Amino acid sequence: MKHLKNIILVVATAIILILMAATIVESSKGTAFVRQHIYTSGWFVVLWGIFAIAAAVYIMQRKSNVGASALLVHASFLIILLGALTSWLLAESGTLHLRQGETTSTMKDAEGEMKALGFEVSLKNFNVVNYPGTDAPMDYVTTLTAKTKGSAESKNSDNTQEIEVSMNNIGSYNGYRFIQSGYDSDMQGTTLGIYHDPWGIGITYTGYALLFISLITTMFSKKTRIRHLYRQALSLQGAKARAITVLLAIAAFMPSAQAQEWVNIDAGIADHFGKICVLYNSRITPINTVATSFVTKLCGKASWEGLSSNQVFAGWIFDVPYWETVKMIEIKEKKAQELLGINGKWASFADFWDSYNNYKLDAPLKKAYKDGDTKLQKQLRDADEKFNIIRMLYGGEMLKMFPYTNKQKHIQWFAPGQPLGNLSLNEQELVFIKKSMDYLAESVIMGDNARAKEIIKKIYSYQHVRGKAVVPTKFRIYTEVGYNKINAQHWPIMLYLTLSLLLAIMSTVCLNAEKLKKAHSVSSVLAWVMLIHTTVLLTLRWYVSGHLPMSNGYETMQFMAWATLIVTLVMQKRFVPIKQFGPLLSAFALLVAMITDGNPQITQLMPVLQSPLLSVHVMVIMFSYALFGLMALIGIQGLIAHHRKQTAKEQQLAALSQFLLYPAVALIAIGIFIGAIWANVSWGRYWSWDSKETWALITMLIYSAPLHADIKWLRKAQHMHLYMLLAFLSVLMTYFGVNYFLSGMHSYA
């Protein structure tokens, strides 16, 4: 038994160290190298097999001492590993290149050999979808025709199906999944990745489902070790607690406005302009909504250098030469910064053009998509999107403000300068549509605010006459503008996060009953304030959108924060930990929502990233990180208590860390596998050994060790505290280190 346990520990440690080394090697040797020589190599699979078999035998030998919930947890991981083994043994992958009208029944595998598909597939059409109003590519769509010939004996007819594949839409036929990978320079050919895994995905999903059920059972079962740890963590009464001071400082360094003349657009005129309605994202909305999204998209927040989003947006319309030189476009990726030739992360629109008036990222992006270089695509996509957002504004796609109702009662919206065709309009209306924005620009530049206000009023009146059936009421417009202003304020969320984190730390470490009572009272007040704030936001969003706010990742996160607060306030009297951590969980959900809204989807770009699964995945992972952070802080306090020979306090804090460890590990496990499901639905594979997901797995394995009570070294409180403190380095590496030092498809920097 002892030797078997040592084998498990040695193999688990070896796996963790190998995974760490692999991510470092990948940054220098490339993904293909580590995938071939480490991740999918036979020796690494054997190592995982030894670990799984040894763990299974050890559990069976100790099954009388292991609860049903713990058995289910371990069984689920074994099933997940079995699914991975099945995929490794039976799954097929390869590439398929087709020209227009060409038919094939084979694919090329990783070794370059041709393998039969069992059906015929032909390229019906390949199409590049551009950003609206521009010639810049937004998506790549392949339309295939797949056909399986019927059996001559059974006289079955042929089974023919049309399949559409795009960047974020996987095509499927007879168990084979098609993923868009590249295209030919003449637009007459396409390259597709093919993946066929008839058994592995199903087995793995079964393991995921069993894991979720077993983790929930473990958390709420009365017979598991977590209950004992909970009682032990709260057993010490009357001990003197020392104050913990946490200083959180946030510094934002923004580039200063360039020292040149510019048109100072009056804030009042900009606000009036912001209430004009436009057709935006298939919805009639005030320009203020477009302005808020536009400015937030470019610089990460809804204002710039003290100017409101309305003023900045109006500036991009009425004072183009100046704003094209302002370095307000945030470029996060180093590769994009290098290609644009900028120092730091701030660029102007002028930085996107070379001396010959060529778009600097055009050639690298086309080559990346042609070659299927997903890493380079990812590095340049965000900068390219921001560039094209500005071009869309110039093309009038964000300023469709003139409605026209035809004889069929269908309402069309036109932008200033857009060809009107043969519309039944009198000469006065035609002149108004064509010239009103020119007159408004002239008034704004000349500082004639009275005339500008009058023109805005006329545009607004025209909208209500020509688009009466669809133009929102004045109350709805003012409500949406008010919602945008409230929602753009990020400081309340940072305040909630700071206060809830401080209160959680105080509630978990402070042992003085009177101070605990005060902390719990403040937690309740904070929960009520957060609930009122979140309810107002959700209600306003519900009203202005006309539907329940649960349609995208941002709304899902806000709703989850609201639901968490409801549960907290309903159950806080009976379950103290819910009172302690409910506001913190809610604050993290609001933080994820804020991060999501910090990169708003002005156009339908990368719709897969709007998946609620992705938002839940990020939220769950982040909350596990928060708990790991708390355990690191508790570890510091525990080591201080050990140094001062406060044995009782040291033991209690160790029990508290172990108590928090259960939900933390459960959350990171659930988060990882929700992410795997999302990846499978979106990209065709549930696990790709990306550096970020590999380090998340490393973190989960590291934090899983203290859950096993038979590891003698961790039974000492001092060792537990030291382990928790050092283990947090893996969290820092996962969240920050991977983004800045390693390669990969994830980036949260």
Task: Place the predicted regions along the sequence by residue.
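Solvent-exposed, non-transmembrane regions of integral membrane proteins
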Residues: M1-A749
